[in-house]
């Protein structure tokens, strides 16, 4: 461990982890980052929307604009008794930094700041601009976070050229995978109406569970598309289903079903909605349904950002990275629709959202070098 005793990225990561910023709280994390970025020549703009703290920091006024994006909020710690160390008291054990947010994603935030400090010091006359878009609402309802900041930037025609999101993209080794896209996400909340009654008198009631079951089975078996070379086929999953009073002798009056699509670029949300409604109507259901659009699919193909990232990872780690679109959503889905090219590169994701979350300190050192090399590849050429 002695080799990391004076590590600036480790020190900053510890400072960030020690702040219990359970979503949507920030607990001063952004101020900690802002103070460092001010010293590096950044202008800081705080954007607070209701319960969410956001920061837009920018150095430079010219294009192209390279933007680090990330979040200071973390998920709840869960059962404290299952943690080997207190989740907000960061400690290093055998090269692993332990604490909530170590991998998702305070380690990445520390690497971003330190990499930027080093880059600006080495290249004070770099081309273009560097920006940070940081929110405390990524792990929560994502209403007042990145999406609101993007709306503000769009309203004043402030554009991002390239964005690197620090989500933990790696699977086995740092840099083995980068995310160059994400599937779209669409949630449906369905209420099927029936008539409550006694189970002994079914002719006097109307069981919504029985009525809805064939339609739900058809939805679950439906092949929505074949996917493509970048995305797997669209997935339909029932996430929650609730009906009944808890009594064994009562036919329920309603059935509530929550389902989610993770969809490829082969379909649109509008097409999925139309097909779902056609199936529900074909089964003669009496229902209400509302939809939540969680994000459009996006894909960043070959180009300067992906090339710069591939080169940096190869230079630092020796790995040939594999661009993938698998996994959940990230705030990249709010940045990509502006026309920006978006990638995700961060630590190994094996312990994210789990008890005893941790990250290799040596990986944070390498991640910092990767971020710095990406800046050099894009803004010094």
Curated annotation (Swiss-Prot):
Binds 2 Zn(2+) or Co(2+) ions per subunit. Its EC number is 3.5.1.18. Keywords: Amino-acid biosynthesis, Cobalt, Diaminopimelate biosynthesis, Hydrolase, Lysine biosynthesis, Metal-binding, Zinc. The active site is at 73, 138 (proton acceptor). GO terms for biological process: diaminopimelate biosynthetic process; L-arginine biosynthetic process; lysine biosynthetic process via diaminopimelate. One of its GO terms (molecular function) is succinyl-diaminopimelate desuccinylase activity. Pathway: Amino-acid biosynthesis; L-lysine biosynthesis via DAP pathway; LL-2,6-diaminopimelate from (S)-tetrahydrodipicolinate (succinylase route): step 3/3. Zn(2+) 2 binds at residues 104, 139, 353. Zn(2+) 1 binds at residues 71, 104, 167. Homodimer. Catalyzes the hydrolysis of N-succinyl-L,L-diaminopimelic acid (SDAP), forming succinate and LL-2,6-diaminopimelate (DAP), an intermediate involved in the bacterial biosynthesis of lysine and meso-diaminopimelic acid, an essential component of bacterial cell walls. Belongs to the peptidase M20A family. DapE subfamily. This is Succinyl-diaminopimelate desuccinylase.
């Amino acid at each position: 461990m002695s080799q990391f005793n004076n590590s600036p990225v480790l020190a900053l990561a510890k400072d960030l982890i020690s702040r219990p910023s359970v979503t949507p709280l920030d607990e001063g994390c952004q101020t900690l980052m802002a103070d460092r970025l001010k010293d590096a020549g950044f202008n800081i703009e705080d954007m607070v929307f209701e319960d969410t703290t956001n920061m837009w920091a920018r150095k430079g006024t010219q294009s192209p604009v390279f933007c680090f994006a990330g979040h200071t909020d973390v998920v709840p710690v869960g059962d404290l008794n299952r943690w080997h160390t207190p989740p907000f008291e960061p400690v290093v054990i055998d090269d692993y930094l332990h604490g909530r947010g170590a991998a998702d994603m305070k380690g990445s935030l520390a690497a971003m700041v330190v990499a930027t400090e080093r880059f600006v010091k080495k290249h004070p006359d770099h081309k273009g601009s560097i920006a940070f878009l940081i929110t405390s609402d990524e792990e929560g309802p994502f209403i007042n976070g990145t999406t609101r900041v993007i709306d503000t930037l769009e309203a004043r025609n402030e554009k991002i050229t390239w964005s690197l999101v620090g989500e933990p993209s790696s699977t086995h080794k740092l840099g083995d995978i980068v995310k160059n896209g994400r599937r779209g996400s669409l949630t449906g909340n369905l209420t099927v109406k029936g008539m409550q009654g006694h189970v002994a008198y079914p002719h006097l009631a109307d069981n919504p569970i029985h009525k809805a079951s064939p339609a739900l089975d058809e939805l679950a078996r439906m092949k929505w598309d074949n996917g493509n070379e970048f995305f797997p086929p669209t997935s339909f999953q029932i996430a929650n289903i609730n009906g009944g009073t808890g009594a064994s002798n009562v036919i329920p009056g309603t059935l509530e079903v929550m389902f989610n699509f993770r969809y490829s670029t082969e379909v649109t949300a509008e097409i999925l909605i139309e097909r779902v409604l056609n199936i529900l109507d074909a089964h003669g259901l009496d229902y209400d349904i509302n939809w939540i659009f969680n994000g459009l699919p996006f894909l960043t193909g070959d180009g300067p950002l992906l090339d710069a990232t591939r080169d940096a990872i190869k230079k630092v780690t020796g790995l040939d990275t594999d661009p993938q679109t698998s996994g959940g959503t990230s705030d990249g889905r709010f940045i990509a629709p502006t026309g920006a090219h978006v990638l995700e590169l961060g630590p190994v994701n094996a312990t994210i959202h789990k008890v005893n979350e941790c990250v290799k300190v040596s990986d944070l050192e390498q991640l910092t070098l990767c971020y710095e090399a990406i800046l050099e590849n894009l803004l010094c050429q």
